[in-house]
Amino acid sequence: MTATVLVFVLAVFVVAGFTKGIIGLGLPTISMGLLAVVLPPTEAAALLILPSLITNVWQMLDGGHLRSVLRRLWPLNLGVCAGTWGGAAFLSGLGGPYGALALGVALMAYALSGLAALKLAVPRAAEVWLGPLAGVVTGAITAATGVFVIPAVPYMQAIGLQKDELVQALGLSFTVSTLALAVTLAGGRAFTWDLAWPSLAALVVAILGMRLGQAVRARLSPQAFRLWFFLGLLALGAYLAARGLV
């Protein structure tokens, strides 16, 4: 990896970490999209694993709701593992541009519905079967694109998690997704020692960006957080859709 590429990679992870610190997600979406400019998809995904894993574990542990979200989200996370491993054959770039386009459009539609105050609601009794289904679909999309967002994020928001619960639940879900993706990449021998130092450097700058973002989030009211959460999803969706059209 040349010095120019490394500087670009580190800048990407600062921005991605900052976004994640504010709204609780966005690191893989932003990183995979921008790193694809200079790196092959499997190499970009391999470089993402360490920063994604550590920042998500940190986010998962940062709060007092871990036990409750673990109890509530185990069906979703079980489905994520099954979907990711089942979709391993698609890792090289699923669905081509149309996969990214469809994912982006779905994300924008969800964000717009949230901004319009259309509240999705999942009955508690339905979580037992809808959680695994949402997890399997999320896992398949993760294997295809390296992005962990759809439909796990709408599902977690629809079961009524509050601001801090939602951010911690996102950390849990993304930790599971990252580990499942890591197993898939290891099976395809995508990890090389050449990526070790760049990955460590990416981790450091991602954490710095995330800390800055968390400081901003701490100052947001629940209403402001909801607004920025959906605006962030809208921007990520537009970015993915634009990527799919190029």
Question: Which role fits each region the language model picked out?
Answer:
Residues 43-50, 101, 168, 172, ...:
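Signature of the 12-TM Major Facilitator Superfamily
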Residues 5-6, 36-53, 97-107, 136-146, ...:
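Structural signature of hydrophobic alpha-helical transmembrane segments
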Residues 38-42, 63-70, 157-165, 188-192:
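Juxtamembrane helix-boundary/capping and inter-helix hinge elements in multi-pass membrane proteins
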Residues 1-38, 120-170, 177:
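Selected transmembrane alpha-helices and immediately adjacent juxtamembrane segments
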Residues 44, 86-90, 141-147, 181-184, ...:
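Hydrophobic alpha-helical transmembrane segments in multi-pass integral membrane proteins
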Residues 11, 15, 50-57, 74, ...:
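Hydrophobic residues within alpha-helical transmembrane segments
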Residues 47-96, 179-223:
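Selective hydrophobic functional segments
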Residues 56-67, 88, 102-127, 214-215, ...:
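Transmembrane helix exit motif
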